């Protein structure tokens, strides 16, 4: 879903950047790493995801951690390939990398996971739950749509509007 949102937002702003494909792949890797880590015993301790045994259940907890770490690192290695595909777009690629790192990091998805883990076994108020969803789910959707807009040459005002819309999309996707 996230790469498609990135591509469609890019198209909406008239983009045709060759830098888009590495970012789409990177986004899917970041999302997958987050699921691998979320399933670990220290986090949600899930045995199954999408009807199949989780990574750590098949390969062990140590390999689950390393697989997630490898996916995150390879995601950024892949995104950096955009510089060689579209060197003339270095400024927008740099801005896209900044957004990707921020939304996947402590002010985004990881921050949401920190709150989630800290609330394990506790009753959680709706506002806190909304914050967790906004950060864990919404942040990567925001990044996807913002990166699509950035690489298409959208203005900062348009990017801020996309971020607001994407936040609503993220919250709606958790409500299903």
Task: For the regions a language model picked out, list residue spans one by one.
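Mg2+-dependent prenyl diphosphate-binding active-site environment of isoprenoid biosynthetic enzymes
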Residues: 1-176
């Amino acid at each position: 879903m996230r790469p498609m949102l990135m591509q469609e937002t890019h198209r909406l702003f008239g983009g045709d950047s060759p830098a888009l494909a590495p970012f789409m792949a990177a986004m899917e890797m970041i999302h997958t790493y987050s699921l691998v880590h979320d399933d670990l015993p220290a986090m949600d301790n899930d045995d199954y995801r999408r009807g199949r045994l989780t990574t750590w259940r098949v390969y062990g907890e140590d390999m689950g951690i390393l697989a997630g770490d490898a996916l995150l690192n390879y995601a950024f290695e892949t995104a950096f390939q955009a510089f060689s595909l579209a060197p003339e777009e270095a400024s927008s690629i740099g801005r896209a990398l900044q957004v990707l790192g921020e939304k996947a990091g402590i002010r985004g998805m990881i921050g949401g996971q920190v709150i989630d883990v800290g609330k394990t076994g506790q009753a959680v108020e709706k506002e806190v739950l909304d914050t967790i969803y906004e950060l864990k789910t919404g942040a990567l959707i925001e990044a996807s749509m913002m990166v699509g807009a950035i690489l298409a040459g959208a203005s900062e005002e348009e990017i801020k509007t996309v971020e607001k819309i994407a936040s609503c999309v993220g919250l709606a996707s958790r409500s299903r």
